Swiss-Prot record:
GN (gene name): rlmL
NCBIfam families: PRK11783.1
Record's protein name: Ribosomal RNA large subunit methyltransferase K/L
Free-text function comment from the UniProt entry: Specifically methylates the guanine in position 2445 (m2G2445) and the guanine in position 2069 (m7G2069) of 23S rRNA.
Similarity remark: Belongs to the methyltransferase superfamily. RlmKL family.
Organism: Shigella flexneri
Catalytic function, reaction form: guanosine(2445) in 23S rRNA + S-adenosyl-L-methionine = N(2)-methylguanosine(2445) in 23S rRNA + S-adenosyl-L-homocysteine + H(+); guanosine(2069) in 23S rRNA + S-adenosyl-L-methionine = N(2)-methylguanosine(2069) in 23S rRNA + S-adenosyl-L-homocysteine + H(+)
EC code(s) of this entry: 2.1.1.173, 2.1.1.264
């Protein structure tokens, strides 16, 4: 009897144990990452040929304590290597694990290689050669703390390489994991199986091979036992011949069918090739088709199973499309696949909840480093009076109501950018802004007392409902998370897409960027303030401090300002402001752009202006600014400096976002200034629900 070890992906150990026992293995013991078992020589070959779940089959050779590199060398050399393989065979060493002595896996592999070579040369036998790419023998060494475990890898290449897939092809799941997904899906052999996002067809091919009794190792051309000294070619040929006979019989007797589709024509072509190489191409119909076009291939029966590994996405900007995809799949299943089963494997349980289906079973597994879940559902047959469940119904109803109200108003006002929803309902804590035919959803980060999973699921419901109510394409929705922050965090960069969208605000044309920054380049709540500046600017010299992207300057320029001066510390935003000015034909020398610390520039400037707009940060301690700034503490000093630049009869429009800001009217009076609060006049309909979003003042000489 041989003592053996079969490795597998985390989470599949019990499934592998059952499979090995069915093959005839005895004394099976599950450990993390695999199963120890025993079997005769025939069982060795059968496990290699027939295991759909094992990553590798190992023949353990021994263990040794490693307190020094010499311990490792002597421990390896103690094994009788001349009984393991002939000197004419090539070998390679795979070494994993480190300890205080062996701190580099390459060094560990070198010591093992030296010990094996010396074991042959000490017996005056030819020195075996190393072949890292295609060795006859693979030696695996695992070092855990002070113990090294040494084994022969009888598989050679990993057993997930069945021989039907081009190694250069990209596969999101290995064939061994795909087989486990099929086994856990609840699909019954002989019933239809459909994968609407099949990619290169791995799930369907593994299912078809299982259904037709085709051994997963049947198409492999190379094995790790070919150079093993104890290899019994006669028994191997018997195992191989039996597998070939069973495959022919299974294919001839199988009567059901498999269906695969994907939106990418190239991967569908690869799937067809893979299925043909696997010997089951005639059983699978592949189509180029988007999920939105998915229909039941057997509307009159029999019932079957939809099985897939849908995309899950790690980038925030991909989530809206994925949420829409899963929501759509859920609706299609309910509408067209009543009575069928559904099984999805995903790294995102939150996305699976967008299906709006209740799972009957679920399994956990690892896909490489990713924690994944497989959920199985039974889709109830629909009845004539069945009504589709609403996602985030209260939110959807409020958004629909707001849309009806604001869409007409915005059209009459001549604006393309406006707020549709602003945390109107506390449990749906987001802002929804429309930019022409795009939508930005900003999630206000939930407090730490809220369960993160529930908060994420609520956000996914919001995304699905937003796409549905507004009737937009998922790729026209941008998702952002906004935390309460200090200073001008609109300068925080989120991406590098560099995609700009031209929008209209009254008579101004402006560039916005919806993806690369936390803010978009246009503060929507200041829309009326900008219009007022345009109306006040005719024939005047205009100064815009903390200018951001210069949208207020554009309105002043279009309003007939004699000159404009735009000051900001960010080169990025000044270049943006220049683009905005150019877009509106404001290109003459009278429109100056200055990159500077606004507070320092203000103290040193000696020019005069008729109209000044300043919208400073609530707080800033930027390294590029000389001093920390607090708008509540420092606004009087700011007004003192501004007064020096204000021409007689001039006006300062002062705005900030500090909640509870208190203007020091007595202090202003001592400076010879007076203030008129115009906050309510600057709040348009879409911001009437949030009266503290900013405060705004007109300041003139007393």
């Amino acid at each position: 009897m041989n003592s053996l070890f079969a490795s597998t992906a985390r989470g599949l150990e019990e499934l592998l144990k059952t499979e090995l026992e069915n093959l005839g293995a005895v004394e099976c013991q599950v450990v993390q990452g695999g199963v120890h078992f025993k079997g005769d020589t025939r069982l060795v070959y059968q496990s290699l040929m027939w295991s759909r779940l094992a990553s590798r089959i190992m023949l353990p050779l021994g263990e040794c304590k490693v307190y020094s590199d010499l311990d490792l060398y002597l421990g390896v050399q103690a094994i009788n290597w001349t009984e393991m393989f002939n000197p004419g065979a090539t070998f390679a060493v795979h070494f994993s694990g480190l300890n205080d002595t062996i701190r580099n896996s390459q060094y560990g592999a070198m010591k093992v290689k030296d010990a094996i070579v010396d074991a042959f040369t000490r017996k005056n036998l030819p020195r075996p050669n190393v072949d890292r790419d295609a060795p006859d023998i693979r030696v695996n060494v695992w070092l855990h703390k002070e113990t090294a475990s040494i084994a022969l890898d009888l598989s050679g290449d990993g057993l997930h390489l069945r021989g039907y897939r081009d190694r250069a092809g990209i596969a999101p799941i290995k064939e061994t994991l795909a087989a486990a997904i099929v086994m856990r899906s609840g699909w019954q052999s002989g019933t239809p199986l459909l994968d609407p996002m099949c990619g290169s067809g791995t799930l369907l091919i593994e299912a078809a091979m299982l259904a037709t009794d085709r051994a997963p190792g049947l198409h492999r051309g190379r094995w790790g036992f070919s150079g093993w000294a104890q290899h019994d070619e006669a028994i191997w040929q018997e195992v191989k011949a039996e597998a070939q006979t069973r495959a022919r019989k299974g294919l001839a007797e199988y009567s059901s069918h498999f269906y695969g589709s994907d939106s990418d024509a190239r991967v569908i072509q690869r799937a067809r090739t893979n299925a043909r190489l696997a010997g089951i191409g005639e059983l699978i119909t592949f189509e180029v088709k988007d999920v939105a076009q998915l229909t039941n291939p057997l509307p009159k029966g029999p019932y079957g199973t939809v099985l897939s590994n849908p995309p899950y996405g790690e980038r925030l900007d991909s989530e809206p499309a994925l949420i829409a995809l899963h929501s759509l799949l859920g609706r299609i299943m309910k509408n067209q696949f009543g009575g069928w089963n559904l099984s999805l494997f995903s790294a995102s349980p939150d996305l699976l909840s967008c299906l709006q289906l209740r799972a009957d079973k679920q399994y956990k597994a690892k896909n490489g480093p990713l924690d994944c879940v497989q959920k199985n559902y039974h889709v109830a047959e629909s009845t004539p009076d069945s009504k589709p469940a609403m996602v985030a119904e209260d939110y959807a109803n409020r958004l629909r109501k707001n849309l009806k109200k604001f869409e007409k108003w915005a059209r009459q006002e001549g604006i393309e950018c406006y707020r549709l929803y602003d945390a109107d309902l506390p449990e749906y804590n987001v802002a929804v802004d429309r930019y022409a035919d795009w939508v930005v959803v900003q999630e206000y980060a939930p407090p730490k007392t809220i369960d993160a999973h529930k908060a994420r699921q609520r956000l996914f419901d919001i995304i699905a409902a937003t796409i549905s109510v507004l009737g937009i394409a998922p790729n026209k929705l941008v998702l952002k998370t906004r935390e309460r922050h200090k200073g001008k965090n609109q300068y925080q960069k989120l991406g590098e897409k560099g995609e700009f969208l031209e929008v209209t605000e009254y008579n101004a044309h402006l560039w916005v960027n919806l993806t690369d920054y936390l803010d978009t380049g246009l503060f929507l709540d200041h829309r009326i303030a900008r219009r007022m500046l345009g109306q006040m600017s005719k024939g005047k010299d205009f100064l815009n401090l903390f200018s951001y992207t210069g949208s207020a300057t554009v309105h002043a320029g279009l309003g007939g300002a004699r000159s404009t001066t735009t000051v900001d510390m960010s080169r990025t935003y000044l270049e943006w402001a220049e683009r905005n000015l150019r877009l509106n034909g404001l290109t003459r020398r009278a429109h100056r752009l200055i990159q500077a610390d606004c507070l320092a520039w203000l103290r040193e400037a000696n020019e005069q202006f008729d109209l000044i707009f300043i919208d400073p940060p609530t707080f800033s301690n930027s390294k590029r600014m000389e001093d920390a700034f607090d708008v509540q503490r420092d606004h009087l000093a700011l007004m003192k400096d501004l007064k020096r630049l204000l021409r007689a009869g001039g006006t300062i429009m002062f705005s900030n976002n500090k909640r509870g800001f208190r203007m020091d009217l007595d202090g202003l009076a001592k400076l010879g200034l007076k203030a008129q609060e115009i906050t309510q006049k600057t709040l348009s309909q879409d911001f009437a629900r949030n009266r503290q979003i900013h405060n705004c003042w007109l300041i003139t000489a007393a």
